[in-house]
């Protein structure tokens, strides 16, 4: 989704009712990363980033350690990554990424949210050509020379570097996630959030009235416990 709309969404997510759902989602992301790539953060860039994101959101260390421990436990839940595609009101395109130990429950919930809020679920793959998957790092603002930083990170897979009033955003091809993550850490940059995101190839502008309709669906999706991230083609 476009940066301006992304910040609008971020300000909504900062409300306490949203924050109260955040820690379980962060814990789930840590657990899945640890189970997929091992529990040693030094050897697992996705786990390092999941931990850094949790810390940036003030998640207590005990919660982080517990999530990692659950991943290595014999009875740890089999949490799967699940991907859905759909349309919201006014034709806005939506990609929903979930983590769930009960896919049947999750698909029923996601379909219900779309149908009750003016949208529809599409067949997976329908939106593949409308979005590009990128490794995206949201960082604290950088006080140094941005051109020099850009040159330093190009060999690690940097494709785009953008700084605004809120943060520094660095992105590259999704396959460069690990290498970019290591290079960013080596530069001492302060990470707020990182992951693989779906970036719209042709963002679309909507009126305020249309955005209000679309956000009803987005709010409901983000409130669902199994939903980790929601991406749109909104400019």
From Swiss-Prot:
Keyword Transcription found: yes
UniProt keywords, alphabetically: Cytoplasm, DNA-binding, Transcription, Transcription regulation
Chief location category: cytoplasm
Subcellular location: Cytoplasm
Transcription keyword on record: yes
GO BP annotation list: regulation of DNA-templated transcription
A GO term for molecular function: DNA binding
Cellular component terms (Gene Ontology): cytosol
Family according to the record: Belongs to the TACO1 family.
NCBIfam families: PRK12378.1, YebC/PmpR family DNA-binding transcriptional regulator
Cited PANTHER family: TRANSCRIPTIONAL REGULATORY PROTEIN YEBC-RELATED, TRANSLATIONAL ACTIVATOR OF CYTOCHROME C OXIDASE 1
Name listed for the protein in its UniProt record: Probable transcriptional regulatory protein Cj1172c
Organism: Campylobacter jejuni subsp. jejuni serotype O:2 (strain ATCC 700819 / NCTC 11168)
